């Protein structure tokens, strides 16, 4: 199977446009060479690290999801029983 040349051109164009966007300091504050001096970037990084640490420290129990999953997985059996006994009865 031959890949069309237009697909190659599209992939290259999208890749170049994405890399140019990331390299522009106005479009991407993380690409700023003085990122350490940027208080917004530092505050964002600290908030992200804190949120990840909290999420990993206190995982939510999976128990509330089990009754919901049991209910959802039983719906096809209930539908089959209703069709068999009430509709086609």
From Swiss-Prot:
Q: Where is the signal peptide?
A: 1-23
Principal location listed in the UniProt entry: secreted
Superkingdom as given in the UniProt entry: Eukaryota
Q: Which residues, renumbered to this chain, carry the PTM Asparagine amide?
A: 88
An annotated GO cellular component of this protein is:
extracellular region
The answer, when asked if Methyltransferase is one of the entry's keywords, is no
Subcellular location(s) of the protein:
Secreted
Q: Does the keyword Acyltransferase apply?
A: no
Question: Which keywords label this protein?
Answer: Amidation, Ion channel impairing toxin, Neurotoxin, Secreted, Signal, Toxin, Voltage-gated sodium channel impairing toxin
Where does tissue-level expression of this protein occur? Expressed by the venom gland.
Q: Which residues form the propeptide?
A: 24-61
Tell me the GO molecular function terms: sodium channel regulator activity; toxin activity
- Tell me, what does this protein do in biology? Vertebrate-selective toxin that causes pain by targeting voltage-gated sodium channels.
Q: Which family does it belong to?
A: Belongs to the formicidae venom clade 1 family.
Q: What is this protein called?
A: Myrmicitoxin(1)-Pr2c
Q: Which source organism does the UniProt entry give?
A: Pogonomyrmex rugosus (Desert harvester ant)
